[in-house]
């Protein structure tokens, strides 16, 4: 049995979690919208076509903010196509996903869905094929009370009150050559700055995020971020980054270590942003939004493969089926987000339904939870509060990692601790522990020294574990992988101790 220990003190904190840290993402991609959150005629659909069974699972998942409408999709999207009478909305070819977009679900329908789901809206604007003019018009349409062309148009469409969207993304992944009208850092920095300026002139209360590097392996990584922030620093509040964990190599130990790379990624982007601030001698600090993150690799395909399939509406693409192994790596990313709560103030799990998602549906049929549903739901429910600095003593292992996509993906940790953990305290005196045992063979004995908390008792203790790391949840067995009770958590005057199963995700809630 492997032995580890954790020590933390309630007076030593990393930072408070922002509610927007627990966000998700809805893109016009595959069956995320059509057949996902929106399916008129489904037995569970309400009068607006929203699937109630999906809404029930979304409310259980507890996301706080939803990014929309993309993603790659937004770089070619004319937002005006998705408002007004549905029978007058045009169908368009979507060059991002080689699909046909019917536009029967658009901005106003999304705002209604957000209200029904009790989540905040995060809107992205098209800075690919369009620019600042379309962006400021959309802000006026969404947020202005009335008496102008765009605000009165919203009223004529049946939404008399402004939507008051506060968080806006200035484009999507504009450093990527796969993006419609991909730009250099200077080109994007200029258009983002001008769009931001006009958007804030329409509504000075906006929070804006600029596109940082899409991934840590981008050839322009670092230089892109520095140049973009030189143009936008004074006008924005956040810089975005994206990450998708993968196991192309088929190496489970390395896969479970890969969330540590996200730790490095965040630290590096923070350093770049702070260097831009330092050159200005500015007290302002930019925050980070990890507005796309997940496990994704099996359903990645080249664009040429999708072109051959024609231009269907809502094709079943990117429908990653998640395993127990994926849930463990995903849990490691959850821990990473919590441990960077001082600077990562927003994040969006990509995506919400069907498309690389925690929730799956069958058209006309049921909805169910994927394996990754559980770590996110537990993080969102129990991860709100002050993240504490935890001293972890754990054996480490070396992860030999290979990504067949190329050597640029070899930015990997030399050593990874078998135990990855985050500790979150709340104002009521309770504390939640998130514990990932990355040892694939051995149980782990964990002792916890919780200082300045007084006597604590176990309110809740669960483990997510399956003997088959390839186990999945599906329509036939939707609860094959689910949290089970973690027994024998021993509480004493000086702390607590427990034994974790190999390859397991564990959550313990303690209260006075």
What function would you assign to each model-found segment?
Residues 242-257:
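Active-site His/acidic residue clusters
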Residues 1-224, 229-238, 262-263, 267-307, ...:
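Non-catalytic accessory regions flanking glycosidase/transglycosidase catalytic cores in CAZymes
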């Amino acid at each position: 049995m492997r032995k580890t220990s954790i020590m933390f003190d309630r007076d030593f904190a990393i930072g408070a979690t922002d509610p927007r840290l627990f966000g998700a993402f809805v893109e016009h991609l595959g069956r995320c919208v059509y057949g996902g959150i929106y399916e008129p005629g489904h037995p569970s659909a309400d009068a607006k076509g929203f699937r109630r069974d999906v809404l029930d699972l979304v409310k259980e998942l507890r996301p706080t903010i939803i990014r929309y409408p993309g993603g790659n999709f937004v770089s070619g999207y004319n937002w005006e196509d998705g408002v007004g009478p549905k029978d007058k909305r045009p169908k368009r070819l979507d060059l991002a996903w080689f699909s046909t977009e019917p536009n029967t679900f658009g901005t106003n329908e999304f705002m209604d869905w957000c209200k029904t789901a009790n989540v905040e809206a995060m809107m992205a604007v098209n800075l690919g094929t369009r620019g600042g003019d379309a962006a400021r018009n959309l802000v006026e349409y969404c947020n202005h009370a009335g008496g102008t062309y765009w605000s009165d148009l919203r009223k004529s469409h049946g939404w008399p009150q402004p939507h008051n969207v506060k968080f806006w993304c200035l484009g999507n992944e504009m450093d990527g050559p796969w993006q419609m009208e991909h730009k250099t850092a200077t080109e994007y920095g200029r258009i983002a700055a001008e769009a931001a300026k006009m958007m804030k002139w329409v509504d000075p209360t906006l929070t804006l995020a600029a596109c940082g590097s899409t991934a840590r392996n981008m050839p322009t990584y670092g230089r892109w971020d520095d140049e973009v922030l030189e143009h936008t620093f004074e006008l924005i509040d956040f810089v975005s980054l994206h990450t998708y964990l993968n196991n192309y190599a088929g190496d489970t130990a390395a896969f479970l270590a890969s969330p540590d790379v996200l730790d490095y990624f965040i630290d590096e982007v923070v350093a770049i942003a702070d260097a831009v601030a330092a050159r200005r001698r500015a007290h302002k600090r930019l925050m980070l939004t990890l507005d796309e993150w997940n496990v994704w690799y099996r359903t990645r395909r080249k664009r040429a493969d999708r072109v051959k399939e024609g231009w269907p509406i809502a094709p079943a693409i990117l429908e990653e089926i998640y395993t127990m192994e994926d849930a463990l790596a995903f849990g490691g990313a959850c821990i990473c987000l919590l441990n960077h709560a001082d600077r990562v103030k927003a994040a969006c799990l990509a995506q919400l339904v069907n498309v690389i998602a925690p929730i799956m549906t069958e058209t006309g049929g049921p909805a169910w939870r994927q394996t990754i549903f559980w770590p996110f739901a537990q993080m969102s429910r129990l991860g709100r509060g002050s993240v504490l600095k935890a001293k972890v003593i754990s054996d480490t292992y070396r992860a030999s990692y290979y990504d067949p996509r190329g050597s640029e993906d070899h930015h990997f940790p030399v050593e990874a601790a078998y135990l990855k953990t985050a500790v979150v305290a709340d104002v009521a005196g309770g504390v939640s522990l998130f514990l990932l045992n990355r040892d694939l063979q051995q149980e782990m004995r964990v002792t916890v020294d919780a200082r300045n908390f007084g006597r604590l008792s176990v309110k809740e203790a669960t483990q997510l574990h399956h003997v088959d790391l390839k186990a999945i949840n599906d329509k036939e067995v939707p609860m094959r992988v689910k949290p089970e009770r973690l027994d024998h958590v021993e509480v004493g005057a000086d702390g607590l101790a427990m034994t974790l199963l190999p390859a397991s995700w564990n959550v313990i809630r303690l209260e006075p």
